[in-house]
């Protein structure tokens, strides 16, 4: 049976500075601590449901996709770069506060969105009661022993994304691609189809489906990761941050595992990794990721 996302209690749109709009979905307990939950590059927040469903009974869960992803209508020009993403995030945070009222709020981010949340927090300002970062693509500064490994990793992803298939005749076609890929084959049963459904939209000409996040937009984010010079210490944030990486010791694991372990140690973070996981740890081992989430939120009086 396909995994079905429950209907949200409320939806609203956040208008961005260039005319793009972010579709916000409010789930869970409206009286609870608020959690803003989103996704990684080329993916979509709905596909993380097997992770965030565990938060619905206690928390006010606001789920959203970054521009040109998921339930949002892509825009032209795409303005698909980190400098824009952090301004978008600021707009989202402020609009949520206006629309839903002030509340203790934590952010839960993965990969690209985690990197954007880091950049937002250190460059624009701290807007959270706590921040949880799942396997951000943290690139050390040049000269660091792990810089080259991350450079190779991001360059490979950039080239892969540039050549990525854009059009599919059916959702099943992309589902099978995810199932056959070494990088995505470890996802929990049912998530391959859910992810495919979440990242595809009907083609304008009605001939099938196409990726919401165009391959050139996905590639641009991978390439820009090498230019951010963002390797902050935990003390540079205005509040508690939890850094959770994929398994740095896992055979075939991405370079983000060792990089986040290094940042965790060198930067003085509250750091953990999830054993036996690759980059999509929240949908490979959602139960363990939820355990770490609740432990961290509880430690800071939010759960």
Feature-to-residue mapping (PLM):
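Conserved loop-alpha-helix segment in the C-terminal half of the alpha/beta-hydrolase fold
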Residues: 235-277
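A catalytic-pocket lid/entrance helix-loop region that shapes and gates access to the active site
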Residues: 134-168
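Post-His helix in hydrolase/transferase enzymes
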Residues: 283-295
């Amino acid at each position: 049976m396909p995994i079905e996302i429950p209907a949200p209690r409320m939806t609203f749109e956040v208008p961005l500075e260039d005319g793009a709009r972010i579709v916000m979905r409010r789930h869970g307990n409206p009286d609870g601590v608020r959690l803003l939950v989103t996704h990684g590059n080329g993916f979509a927040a709905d596909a993380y449901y097997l992770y965030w469903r565990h938060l619905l009974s206690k928390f006010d869960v606001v789920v959203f996709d970054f521009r040109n992803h998921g339930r949002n209508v892509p825009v032209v020009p795409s303005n698909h770069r980190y400098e824009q993403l952090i301004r978008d995030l600021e707009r989202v945070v402020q609009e949520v506060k206006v629309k839903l009222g002030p509340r203790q709020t934590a952010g839960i981010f993965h990969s690209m969105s985690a990197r954007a949340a880091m950049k937002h927090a250190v460059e624009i300002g701290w807007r959270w009661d706590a921040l949880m970062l799942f396997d951000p693509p943290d690139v050390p500064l040049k000269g660091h022993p792990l810089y080259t490994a991350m450079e190779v990793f991001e360059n490979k992803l950039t080239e892969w994304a540039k050549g990525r298939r854009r059009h599919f005749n059916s959702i099943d076609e992309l589902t099978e691609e995810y199932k056959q890929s070494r990088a995505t084959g470890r996802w929990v049963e049912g998530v391959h189809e859910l992810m495919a459904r979440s990242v595809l939209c009907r083609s304008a000409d009605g001939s099938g489906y196409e990726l919401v996040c165009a391959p050139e937009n996905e590639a641009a984010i991978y390439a820009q990761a090498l230019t951010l010079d963002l390797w902050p210490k935990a003390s540079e944030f205005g509040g508690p941050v939890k850094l959770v990486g994929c398994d740095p010791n896992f055979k075939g694991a991405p370079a983000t595992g060792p990089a986040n372990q290094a940042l965790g140690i060198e930067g003085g973070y509250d750091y953990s990794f999830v054993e036996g996981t690759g980059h999509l740890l929240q949908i490979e081992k959602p139960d363990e990721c939820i355990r770490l989430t609740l432990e961290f939120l509880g430690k800071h009086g939010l759960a």
